[in-house]
Structure formats: structure tokens, C-alpha cells
């Protein structure tokens, strides 16, 4: 049985092998020589029997069937006018990137939406408000004295100048004149605060660009100034020292001598920083010609402070509208020429020296006398009087529980803060609490001009532009 099946299988195999093979009829029209150009029917496959068909969505997606450009010629050899190139006519979409809010060079919670063309900044859209705390509204629910510490939290790098601005506004509404010693103390600590701010500004700017050493050197000097803050007010950061009616307390013994000793050696620290940066080739290349703003544009963008003076406008509120003891000191206002980041850096370096000059004059001209107005309805009586006089104790109790009533009216007070013009608009309805407080922060206006300063620069230059603005988002977002 097995043998019979084997024979049948062999015969069937022989029969299949001897069968005539089927030949495929070739179409002579489809036969062509080898060429680089493919036939159009191969480029447009159609599988209608299977329910699928590839349909081109536009002329731009059609295959290039004329590799040698023969179709672009007329019969006489003259070139034809090519149709509109849809790819070139189509708008090119720029790349959008988020800068921050967690970027180390953003100096806080800055969020920038940058529209880039390659690495070139086409448009910059700053988004603010991530540090908004409602400071202006909170002040409406506090007495004038209780509202003062909120100003320390605005620009938390230059604290006492914020307090000074609010105190001047309240004193203008109260129509009081503070003692001379209080004026000189305020002026001296305003310049110490200016040095504190510029140290942070210039040296963190240098660190953002890539120079680490000046940052470490400068913070050693900032530590000494923080000690002066602590000795005069008890707090290193949020001092609440400058108050309506004067200052909180007199300068402790020995502090003026220590400030003098510090001021005599700080000039050498400025020179060391300038040796590291001013003639540094990398520093110059990163700053010169970057963030240029003309004097007219700076005025139109509401720039103040160094951002305005760097463009050649000699505007300083300490000179034009002097307050406290600034009308009794001599100093110069440094002004830039080109309006770029490098000129603004040079202005800040010169302001170090001018602030030292003012501090020396304050130390030499500091008069003796009280540091607060002797009106116990505005400033508290001394501790010794409280322990002996019942009326002084009542004044102290009412001052810190109820506060003092400010006559109805409104006023705007502006000072030359380290970052620019810091202004406070206060409206009083005659009660112990302000009806409205509006804060004019210089950094808010400067950040509004970021698009103007950065447009056309590289992405890496955005860090240099942010650094030269000296932004602190406590005051920008308020």
C-alpha cells in the first residue's frame, strides 16, 4: 500500500513538471530605457479594489516629474513664467519658548514667552502676577503704622527706601516736619540701601553672564551692610525702621564709627570689581550694543533711574525734587551715552562712588537731637516717660491699637529709589486707615519695555537684558 502511494506521487510530480509554463504577455508600450524620471502611474498608486486611495492634498505634494526642467521651456525654448511657489508663500511659523518662571536668571518668578526665529528674538511677552499678594488692598485694612511693614516686602533688596517713600507721603498728609537728625539718618541709610541694591544688581548680572568671582566678593560686603541694618533696627531684611514722623530709634553707640571704617575701605572693593569686569573682553562683548534704547524711547516707555540715565537723560529726583537732607549734600549724577547694557553698568558703578560720597557727608554733618516728632499722637513717647506719666502710657496704647487719624486728602510722593522712581499715591478719608494706596513700582515699567530692548537680539542676550533691568518681583507684582 505504501509502495502504491509512493508511485502515484511520483507520477503526479512528473506530470506537473512536463506541463507547459505560462508566459506573461509584456506590453511593448510600457517597456522603456532606464531613466531617472519615473512614470506618473507609478507615482500615483490607486487601490480602489481594496477601498484605499492615496490622494495628494495640494500641488506642493506632487512628485517632481520634471527633474531636468524641460516642462519650464516653451516650444521655442523661451522659459515659461513659473506658477506661485506655495511653500515660499506659506507663512513660516516661529518657534515659541517659555523662559521661566523657574529659570535661575529670571530674578524671581518672571515668565517670558519668547517668539524665536532660530535664535533671534522676534517678540517677547512678559507674564507677571505670579508673586501678586494684594499689597495695595491689604494696606486699606491696616492703620498707617501697620501698613508700613508691607513696603519692606515690595522691593526686598532695597527695603528702607520703600519705607521712606510711604513715610514721606503720610507726613505730607499730616503736614509735619521731622527733626534734622532724622533727615540725615534717613539719607545715610537710603544710600547704604542703594549700595546694597546695586551690589545685588551688578554682581548677579555678572553671574548670569558667567562671572562668578565678583558675586562672591560682593556678598561679603553686603553682609557688612546687613549688620548695620540689624544693629539699627533689629532686623537684617525687613527693618520697619523709617516711620512716619522720623525713624524708629536713634543710632546705637559706635555704629557711626563702624560705618566710617567700612566706607573708607569700600572704595577699594569697587576698584577690584571694576578690574574684573569693566575691561573684561567677554563682559564687553556680552553687554556693549545689547538692549539699546534711545533717550526718546526711554521717556516714552516711562523708564526712570539708571534705565533712563543710561540713555543720556540726567533725571534724578534727589536733584530735581530733593527730599530729606538731599538738598544739603553734594553729589554728581552719572549719565550714559549709548543707552546699552554696558553704559547702564558703568552708571551703577559710578553710583557706588557717589553714594559713598553722600555717606561721608552724612557722617560729618550728622546733628544731635531727637529722631522723631514730639507729637505723641503720631510717634510713641519714650519708654522712660511711659513708666512715669499716665498720659504718655495712654498715648502709647492708643497709637498701637487705634492708630492716628490722617486729615482727608490725597497726595503723591516719589523718591529716587535704587531701581528708579518709587512712588506712592495715598488717599485719606480722615480715618485711621488709608482709603486707597497705589504703588508706582519702577520695575513694572521697565519690564514693559523688555520687548523693545530684546527684539532682534539672540536668545542668550535676553539674560543680559533682564540683568540690566534690575528686576525684583515683589514690587513688580505687588
Curated annotation (Swiss-Prot):
Protein's job: Core subunit of the mitochondrial membrane respiratory chain NADH dehydrogenase (Complex I) that is believed to belong to the minimal assembly required for catalysis. Complex I functions in the transfer of electrons from NADH to the respiratory chain. The immediate electron acceptor for the enzyme is believed to be ubiquinone.
Major localization listed first in the record, in broad terms: mitochondrion
Top-level taxon in the UniProt lineage: Eukaryota
Cofactor requirement: [4Fe-4S] cluster
Protein name per Swiss-Prot or TrEMBL: NADH-ubiquinone oxidoreductase 49 kDa subunit, mitochondrial
Catalytic activity, as annotated: a ubiquinone + NADH + 5 H(+)(in) = a ubiquinol + NAD(+) + 4 H(+)(out)
Subcellular location: Mitochondrion inner membrane
Amino acid at each position: 500500500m505504501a509502495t502504491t502511494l509512493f508511485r502515484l506521487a511520483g507520477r503526479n510530480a512528473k506530470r506537473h513538471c512536463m506541463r507547459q509554463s505560462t508566459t506573461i504577455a509584456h506590453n511593448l508600450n510600457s517597456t522603456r530605457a532606464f531613466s531617472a524620471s519615473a512614470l506618473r502611474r507609478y507615482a500615483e498608486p490607486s487601490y480602489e479594489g481594496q477601498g484605499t486611495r492615496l490622494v495628494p492634498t495640494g500641488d506642493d505634494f506632487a512628485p517632481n516629474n520634471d527633474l531636468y526642467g524641460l516642462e519650464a521651456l516653451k516650444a521655442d525654448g523661451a522659459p515659461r513664467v513659473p506658477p506661485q511657489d506655495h511653500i515660499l508663500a506659506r507663512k513660516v511659523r516661529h518657534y515659541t519658548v517659555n523662559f521661566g518662571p523657574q529659570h535661575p536668571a529670571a530674578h524671581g518668578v518672571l515668565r517670558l514667552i519668547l517668539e524665536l526665529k532660530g535664535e533671534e528674538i522676534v517678540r517677547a511677552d512678559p507674564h507677571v502676577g505670579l508673586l501678586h499678594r494684594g499689597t495695595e488692598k491689604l494696606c486699606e485694612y491696616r492703620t498707617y503704622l501697620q501698613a508700613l511693614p508691607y513696603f519692606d516686602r515690595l522691593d526686598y533688596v532695597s527695603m528702607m527706601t520703600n519705607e521712606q517713600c510711604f513715610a514721606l507721603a503720610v507726613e505730607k498728609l499730616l503736614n509735619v516736619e521731622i527733626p534734622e537728625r532724622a533727615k540725615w539718618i534717613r539719607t545715610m541709610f537710603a544710600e547704604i540701601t542703594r549700595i546694597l541694591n546695586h551690589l545685588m544688581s551688578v554682581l548677579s548680572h555678572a553671574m548670569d553672564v558667567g562671572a562668578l568671582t565678583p558675586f562672591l566678593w560682593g556678598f561679603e560686603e553686603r553682609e557688612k551692610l546687613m549688620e548695620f541694618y540689624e544693629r539699627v533696627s533689629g532686623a537684617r531684611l525687613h527693618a520697619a525702621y523709617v516711620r512716619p514722623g522720623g525713624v524708629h530709634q536713634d543710632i546705637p553707640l559706635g555704629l557711626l564709627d563702624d560705618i566710617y571704617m567700612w566706607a573708607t575701605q569700600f572704595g577699594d572693593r569697587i576698584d577690584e570689581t571694576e578690574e574684573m569686569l569693566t575691561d573684561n573682553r567677554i563682559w564687553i562683548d556680552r553687554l556693549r550694543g545689547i538692549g539699546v534704547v534711545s533717550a526718546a524711547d526711554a521717556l516714552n516707555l516711562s523708564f526712570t533711574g539708571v534705565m533712563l540715565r543710561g540713555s543720556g537723560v540726567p533725571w534724578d529726583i534727589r536733584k530735581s525734587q530733593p527730599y530729606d537732607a538731599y538738598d544739603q549734600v553734594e553729589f554728581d549724577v552719572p549719565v550714559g551715552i549709548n543707552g546699552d547694557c554696558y553704559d547702564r553698568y558703568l552708571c551703577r558703578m559710578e553710583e557706588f562712588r557717589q553714594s559713598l560720597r553722600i555717606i561721608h557727608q552724612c557722617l560729618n554733618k550728622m546733628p544731635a537731637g531727637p529722631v522723631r516728632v514730639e507729637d505723641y499722637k503720631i510717634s510713641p513717647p519714650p519708654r522712660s516717660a511711659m513708666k512715669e506719666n499716665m498720659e504718655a502710657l495712654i498715648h502709647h496704647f492708643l497709637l498701637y491699637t487705634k492708630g492716628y487719624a490722617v486729615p482727608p486728602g490725597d497726595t503723591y510722593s516719589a523718591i529716587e529709589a535704587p531701581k528708579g522712581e518709587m512712588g506712592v499715591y495715598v488717599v485719606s478719608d480722615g480715618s485711621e486707615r488709608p482709603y486707597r494706596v497705589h504703588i508706582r513700582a519702577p520695575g513694572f515699567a521697565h519690564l514693559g519695555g523688555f520687548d523693545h530692548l530684546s527684539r532682534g537680539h539672540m536668545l542668550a542676550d535676553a539674560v543680559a537684558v533682564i540683568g540690566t533691568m534690575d528686576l525684583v518681583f515683589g514690587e513688580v507684582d505687588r
